[in-house]
Swiss-Prot record:
Gene field: TLR3
Secretion signal span: 1-26
Segments forming domain LRRNT: 27-52
SUPFAM superfamilies membership: L domain-like (SSF52058), Toll/Interleukin receptor TIR domain (SSF52200)
Protein name: Toll-like receptor 3
Any one GO MF annotation of this record: signaling receptor activity
Subcellular locations according to the entry: Endoplasmic reticulum membrane; Endosome membrane; Early endosome
Length: 904
């Protein structure tokens, strides 16, 4: 008999199965639109279960050591194969044979050390080959000779000591050759002659310690348009030699950034005279001195970058010869910290006079003392001038500050971060073409009279945000009616409520920013006349009082008339009320920001006109209820909603509609699952609003009629049940009476028709009492004759028949009611029923009840279906306990017997 396996074997078998399942599920490639992404999956082999029609395969960041050609047979349509960041050490020629349409092959960051002549023999359609960051130290023979369509070859970050990549002419279509970060120390014609038929647009040799440029090295290349030698530690003399070697070449772009070019002499770029160089990058080269006429050899130059240097002096001939320069970057070019103004970098007058074609000048982040009368003289085509953080003592802008720009068609002027404190009248009067003026982030503190902007006839935007303080007047902007964008954020704005409004002269205004000014008082004419306004920023002010119904004169409708407004920001104003007509005129509004206020209950029709709203922000308010009557119109076409951090009341009345909406809409709702939480009731506190169960909250409107009908039916049913329970006997009794009336029963009350005054119904056990008390009455009054069963029933007649006949011949029927009668079966089943029937046929008071005992009404009804309420009071008698009251009882009985059988 076999022994059972130990428990730990089962345990480890289960763990192994679980690990295999988890591993297989984790190693799943993502396939979308013929692109397979298998990156970061720790793959050791090529997946074999991908669609055969994929054109892009990403295998980066795995553990591949080979790219077996057989594994790519099923993926023959691949055009891009990325195998970067693996451990591939060898490429097999058959790879491209199985991938005939391959155009881009990326094998960067692998362990490839050698390339044979056969490696790429079948890669004839390859256009890009990336082999950067491998271990290739030398290229032997001609591994790239068959790559006739190759456009880009990247061999950077290898250990190459030479630029020689082949022994014969090849790579005739190559445009980019990247050899940066290698160990190349010299450039010779023999090492570059394989490019004799190539037209290189970019030769990247940066971060190589090149110490020699052999004669004719660049002429060995068929055509060279761009050369990068950044971070090559080129000295001034080596740079001059480089330029000589570039003479008479097709060079257009030359980048020499991050070198050791501390001085540029008159001869440094002389070798470039016979070129068409258009772009020169000399940034981060520790440049201090530029001799006169240094750039005289570059008449075709259009772009010059000198940023991040330490130039001491710019003379009137520093830029001589740059007659075609269009873009000049001098950012951080003159930076040198100094306490003394005399030792600050110096710019002579007329330094830019030679730059007749200059359109863009960037002089940001420098340390100039000020602007002289002729600093920018000669810039007759300048359109963009940035002087941000450029001056150490430019405190006041006078009418002479920009005199040197009088002849320039300047469109943009950036003066931010210069500690400017005052703008004098006519300071910009020379800049009649200016469209954008940026004065932000300064220390301006003054009253704006309007003369500051005199002469800005074409101004479109004025940026004054983040200054010390600005006091407005009625005429503050009368000189700039063309203004379309006005930024006044965080300027401690004063006198905003002046009348007429300071913004009334701006009929073309499209954007107005008045945020972060603690504005507390405005009038309803503040924005009057701004019919073209599209964007209004009023956040971070104190406008809450203006919209209160308790405000003297009522809410201030300062938004009226803005029929073209599209974006409105009213966040952080302390609003706790919104007038019902606050947004009435804003029919084209696309975005409203009311976040970080104190709003709780909004008027029902406040958003009725905002049917085009796309974005609504109400975050961090006190909103508890989101109902359709308020938010329905606003949510109709909404694309973005932000109502985070509101204390939602999670009840059917408050958010049922909202929950249904957010669970069915395609609107982008920020952080819905985390920051839309219930606050009340307590059992839902902290519960996500989107998970609130609305099934008990079905809209009652469609079922209201049904509810009312059901309720009425239920109430009627309960009423009938109670009526039957308490008065059913009465209804039954009168129903029977009515039926017999309808059937034509007539009242019979003729004395001669009856033989007996009354028929006495009693229990058999009570016969002695009946005989004892009724016989003496007959003896006393001979007109009274009672029908007693023991005495008056005919012999030989059936008892039941005798009872019927006797009842019919009796004028009245007397019930002697005792406990015995209630238990007597004959009385219960026949006598009482027949007597009641007779009473109904004759009339309603032909029955007399004599109670010998106290019998509750419910017992009487239960046993005999009789109730005291069915009879007149004189027909209900109680046998007296006291003997002296017996005569009175007899008198009452005679009265009852003598009463006429009238209708009850």
């Amino acid at each position: 008999m076999s022994r059972p396996l130990p428990y730990h074997i089962y345990f480890f078998t289960g763990l192994l199965t679980c690990w295999i399942l988890c591993t297989s599920s984790a190693h799943k490639c993502t396939v979308r639109h013929e692109v397979a992404d298998c990156s970061h999956l720790k793959l050791t082999q090529i997946p074999e279960d991908l669609p055969t029609n994929i054109t892009v395969l990403n295998l980066t960041h795995n553990q591949l050591r080979r790219l077996p050609p057989a594994n790519f047979t099923r993926y023959s349509r691949l055009t891009i194969l990325d195998g970067g960041f693996n451990s591939i050490s060898k490429l097999e020629p058959e790879l491209c044979q199985n991938l005939p349409w391959l155009e881009i092959l990326n094998l960067q960051h692998n362990e490839i050390s050698q390339l044979s002549d056969k490696t790429f023999v079948f890669c004839m359609n390859l256009t890009e080959l990336h082999l950067m960051s491998n271990s290739i130290q030398k290229i032997q023979n001609d591994p790239f000779k068959n790559l006739k369509n190759l456009i880009k070859l990247d061999l950077s970050h290898n250990g190459l000591s030479s630029t020689k990549l082949g022994t014969q002419l090849q790579l005739e279509n190559l445009q980019e050759l990247l050899l940066s970060n290698n160990k190349i120390s010299s450039l010779t014609p023999e090492e570059l002659d394989f490019l004799g038929n190539s037209s290189l647009e970019r030769l990247e040799l940066s971060s190589n310690q090149i110490k020699e440029f052999s004669p004719g090295c660049f002429h060995a290349i068929g055509k060279l348009s761009g050369l990068s030698l950044n971070n090559a530690k080129l000295s001034p003399s080596l740079t001059e030699k480089l330029c000589l070697e570039l003479s008479n070449t097709s060079i257009e772009n030359l980048s020499l950034s991050s070198n050791q070019l501390d001085t540029i002499s008159h001869t440094t770029f002389s070798g470039l005279k016979q070129t068409n160089l258009t772009t020169l990058d000399l940034s981060r080269s520790s440049l201090r001195v530029m001799d006169n006429d240094s750039f005289a050899w570059l008449p075709h130059l259009e772009y010059l970058s000198l940023e991040y240097n330490n130039i001491e002096h710019l003379s009137s001939r520093s830029f001589y010869g740059l007659s075609n320069l269009r873009h000049l970057n001098l950012r951080w070019s003159f930076t040198r910290q100094s306490i003394s103004l005399t030792s600050l970098p110096k710019i002579d007058d007329f330094s830019f006079q030679w730059l007749k074609c200059l359109e863009y000048l960037n002089m940001e982040d420098n340390n100039f003392p000020s602007i002289k009368r002729n600093t920018f003289t000669g810039l007759v085509r300048l359109k963009f001038l940035s002087l941000s953080n450029s001056f150490s003592s430019l405190r006041t802008l006078t009418n002479e500050t920009f005199l040197s720009l009088a002849g320039s068609p300047l469109l943009l002027l950036n003066l931010t971060k210069n500690k400017i404190s005052k703008i004098q009248s006519g300071a910009f009067s020379w800049l009649g073409h200016l469209e954008v003026l940026d004065l932000g982030l300064n220390e301006i503190g003054q009253e704006l009279t309007g003369q500051e902007w005199r002469g800005l006839d074409n101004i479109v935007e004025i940026y004054l945000s983040y200054n010390k303080y600005l006091e407005l007047t009625t005429n503050s902007f009368t000189s700039v009616p063309s203004l379309q964008r006005l930024m006044l954020r965080r300027v401690a704005l004063k006198n905003v409520a002046c009348s007429p409004s300071p913004f009334r002269p701006l009929p073309n205004l499209v954007i107005l920013d008045l945020s972060n000014n603690n504005i507390a008082n405005v009038n309803d004419e503040l924005l009057k006349g701004l019919e073209k306004l599209e964007i209004l920023d009023l956040q971070h002010n104190n406008l809450a009082r203006l919209w209160k119904h308790a405000n003297p004169g009522g809410p201030v409708q300062f938004l009226k008339g803005l029929s073209h407004l599209r974006i409105l920001n009213l966040g952080s104003n302390g609003f706790d009320e919104i007038p019902v007509e606050a947004f009435k005129d804003l029919r084209e509004l696309k975005s409203i920001d009311l976040g970080m206020n104190n709003l709780n209950i909004l008027p029902q029709s406040v958003f009725d006109n905002q049917v085009s709203l796309k974005s609504l922000s109400l975050q961090k308010n006190l909103i508890t209820s989101v109902q359709k009557t308020v938010f329905g119109p606003a949510f109709r076409n909404l694309s973005y909603l932000d109502m985070r951090f509101n204390p939602f009341d999670c009840t059917c009345e408050s958010i049922a509609w909202f929950v249904n909406w957010i669970n069915s809409t395609h609107t982008n709702i920020s952080e819905l699952s985390n920051h839309y939480l219930c606050n009340t009731p307590p059992q839902y506190h902290g519960f996500p609003v989107m998970l609130f169960d609305v099934s008990p909250c079905k809209d009652s409107a469609p079922f209201e009629l049904l509810f009312m009908i059901n309720t009425n039916i239920l109430l009627i049913f309960i009423f009938i049940v109670l009526l039957i329970h308490f008065e059913g006997w009465r209804i039954s009794f009168y129903w029977n009476v009515s039926v017999h009336r309808v059937l034509g029963f007539k009242e019979i009350d003729r004395a001669e028709q009856f033989e007996y005054a009354a028929y006495i119904i009693h229990a058999y056990k009570d016969r002695d009492w009946v005989w004892k008390h009724f016989s003496p009455m007959e003896e006393e009054d001979h007109t009274l004759r009672f029908c007693l069963e023991e005495r008056d029933f005919e012999a030989g007649v059936l008892k039941l028949e005798a009872i019927v006949n006797s009842i019919r011949r009796s004028r009245k029927i007397i019930f002697v009611i005792t406990q015995n009668l209630l238990k007597d079966p004959l009385c219960k089943r026949f006598k009482v029923h027949r007597a009641v029937q007779q009473a109904i046929e004759q009339n309603l008071d032909s029955i007399i009840l004599i109670f010998l005992e106290e019998i509750p009404d419910y017992k009487l009804n239960h046993a005999l279906c009789l109730r005291r309420g069915m009879f007149k009071s004189h027909c209900i008698l109680n046998w007296p306990v006291q003997k002296e009251r017996v005569n009175a009882f007899h008198h009452k009985l005679k009265v009852a017997l003598g009463s006429r059988n009238s209708a009850h």
